């Protein structure tokens, strides 16, 4: 009988291993400490959904916006699981999904849901990996790289001979922007906070790097451009570089505000746009730009082929286990990172 009991217990443990998974639960909107690891059932996909067995997960500023409650939570799931990107193999496929199948290796971006061993996501947010790229490079670059692609090609068509200013040039998006913008033939000016970050931005292809802890970035931009200013400003910092970002733009230039690492801009007066030279402002988000399957496939190919052949180097700041997600968020929000953080499983 003892052997039978032991065997049954082992079977239970084995079944539990198949049926249960580790996820990160958000218990309440607010600080990073509101996240904790829990065990839950492996989900089943509904119509139009897939479940991906993650190999690795990426960390993005977007995760902090959903976690803090800045962005409304997009689903009604019982457990709130943050996380915006991952790479892995499809574990199961929901009804109506025809362009992906079980076993396919995919990368994906999603508003929430990635901080799990088995991520339940909308199939439209995944793309099959057809280029041979290292898994950690994939999760350190997918959301950031697709963001870089739409900002440089679609939100504004950056062309050879133009001048672009990029805030947070040493961050994950910033380092990809420097390299890709240089490839296009534009003059790339980056702002950073601190000498170490300045070094990282220079390595990432920026022609000019301004440390805004040390110098007035608007005055520096005027000097670099001989008072001609920039065609476009790519701003993921917001509050602390406002309204200086607009002062760096040529008449009819575009201010592309795609994040707010230093806090939101409140009480923005649209009349400022006319006062500063008939400027344009946009607040884009990646999911609008990958809603079209062909555009999503093309942007992914443009990104991964550049990583595979070395045109784009992916900066990885650190690799941390899923259980250290609180620490990872605090690093990111403390603006202590140079490149992406990879969450390992």
Task: Give the predicted meaning of each segment.
Residues 192-195, 240-311, 344-345:
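Glycine-rich phosphate-binding loop and adjacent beta-alpha segment
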Residues 18-20, 279, 311-319, 326-345:
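C-terminal capping/lid region of NAD(P)-dependent oxidoreductase domains
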Residues 92, 105-168:
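NAD(P)H dinucleotide-binding glycine-rich loop of Rossmann-like/cofactor-binding domains
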Residues 1-15:
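Single conserved hydrophobic/aromatic residue that forms the stacking wall/gate
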Residues 138, 142-214:
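Mid-domain Rossmann-like dinucleotide-binding core that forms the NAD(H)/NADP(H) cofactor-binding site
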Residues 105, 163, 187, 253-254, ...:
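Short glycine-centered segments of the SAM/dcSAM-binding site in methyltransferase folds
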């Amino acid at each position: 009988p003892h052997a039978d009991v032991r065997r049954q217990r082992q079977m239970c443990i084995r079944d539990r291993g198949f049926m249960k998974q580790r996820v990160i639960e958000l218990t309440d909107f607010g600080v990073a400490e509101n996240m904790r690891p829990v065990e839950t059932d492996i989900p089943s996909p509904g119509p139009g959904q897939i479940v991906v067995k993650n190999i690795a997960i990426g960390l993005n500023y977007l995760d902090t916006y959903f976690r803090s409650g800045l962005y409304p939570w997009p689903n009604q799931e019982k457990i709130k699981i943050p996380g915006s990107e991952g790479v892995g193999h499809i574990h199961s496929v929901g009804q109506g999904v025809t362009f992906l199948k079980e076993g396919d290796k995919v990368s994906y971006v999603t508003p929430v849901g990635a901080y799990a061993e088995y991520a339940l996501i909308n199939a439209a947010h995944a793309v099959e990996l057809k280029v041979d790229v290292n898994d950690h490079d994939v999760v350190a670059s997918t959301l950031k790289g697709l963001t870089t692609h739409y900002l440089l090609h679609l939100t504004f068509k950056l062309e050879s001979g133009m001048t672009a200013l990029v805030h947070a040039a040493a961050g994950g998006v910033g380092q990809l922007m420097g390299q890709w913008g240089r490839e296009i033939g534009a003059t790339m000016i980056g702002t950073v906070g601190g000498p170490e970050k300045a070094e990282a931005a220079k390595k990432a292809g920026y022609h000019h790097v301004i440390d805004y802890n040390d110098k007035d970035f608007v005055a520096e931009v005027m000097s670099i451009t001989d008072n001609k200013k920039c065609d476009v400003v790519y701003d993921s910092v917001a509050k602390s570089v406002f309204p200086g970002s607009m002062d760096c733009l040529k008449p009819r230039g575009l201010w592309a505000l795609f994040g707010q690492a230093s806090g939101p801009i409140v009480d923005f007066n649209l009349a400022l746009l006319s006062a500063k030279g008939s400027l344009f402002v946009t607040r884009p988000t990646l999911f609008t730009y990958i809603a079209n399957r062909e555009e999503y496939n093309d942007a992914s190919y443009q990104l991964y082929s550049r990583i595979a052949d070395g045109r784009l180097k992916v900066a990885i700041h650190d690799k941390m286990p899923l259980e250290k997600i609180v620490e990872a968020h605090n690093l990111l929000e403390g603006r202590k990172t140079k490149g992406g953080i990879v969450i390992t499983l």
